Amino acid sequence: MPKTKHWHYSIPPEELDDERTAKAFIRELRISPKHAREICRAIRGMPLDRAKEFLRRVIRKEEAVPFRKHKKKVPHRRQIRPGWDAGRFPEKAAREILRVLEHAEANAEYKGLDTDRLYIKHIAAHKGRVIRGWIPRAFGRATPFNTPTTHIEVILEER
């Protein structure tokens, strides 16, 4: 019998206090794993309200996300936080991560947690499967056109 894939969070459930945490997990988002990773790194540890406002500013192109790992040929930005220079405005990834944060906030509200005291304890982006596609070209050839997907997990904790 083939093994089935079991989805789980990076943090084991024994390390979490169910009374003070809320979780959300979205799979197979059609966003760049590199953009998602950089956004997750930028907002990890932030209070929830501040993280949501940061993502809204990224979508409006008012503040850039610092690109620390995937920064080759990334231009320097004036709209970036002090201490870093290379950055981008990954709107699509920011919109999807904002949606995941809103799901986690709704879960926290359902559990009776105070949403004003929530902060992002854990957020991570993992590569998902690649959706394969082909573009027909001249003389009967074809070029691969692959779409990466990303899994995002969020754990909010009440302070």
UniProtKB/Swiss-Prot annotation:
The keyword Ribonucleoprotein applies. This protein binds specifically to 23S rRNA. It makes multiple contacts with different domains of the 23S rRNA in the assembled 50S subunit and ribosome. The globular domain of the protein is located near the polypeptide exit tunnel on the outside of the subunit, while an extended beta-hairpin is found that lines the wall of the exit tunnel in the center of the 70S ribosome. One of its GO terms (cellular component) is cytosolic large ribosomal subunit. PROSITE patterns: RIBOSOMAL_L22 (PS00464). SUPFAM superfamilies: Ribosomal protein L22 (SSF54843). One of its GO terms (molecular function) is rRNA binding. InterPro entries: Ribosomal_uL22, Ribosomal_uL22_CS, Ribosomal_uL22_euk/arc, Ribosomal_uL22_sf. GO terms for biological process: cytoplasmic translation. The lineage of its organism: Archaea, Methanobacteriati, Methanobacteriota, Methanomada group, Methanopyri. NCBIfam families: PRK04223.1, uL22_arch_euk. Pfam families: Ribosomal_L22. The keyword Ribosomal protein applies. It comes from Methanopyrus kandleri (strain AV19 / DSM 6324 / JCM 9639 / NBRC 100938). Keywords: Ribonucleoprotein, Ribosomal protein, RNA-binding, rRNA-binding. This is Large ribosomal subunit protein uL22. PANTHER family: 60S RIBOSOMAL PROTEIN L17. Part of the 50S ribosomal subunit.
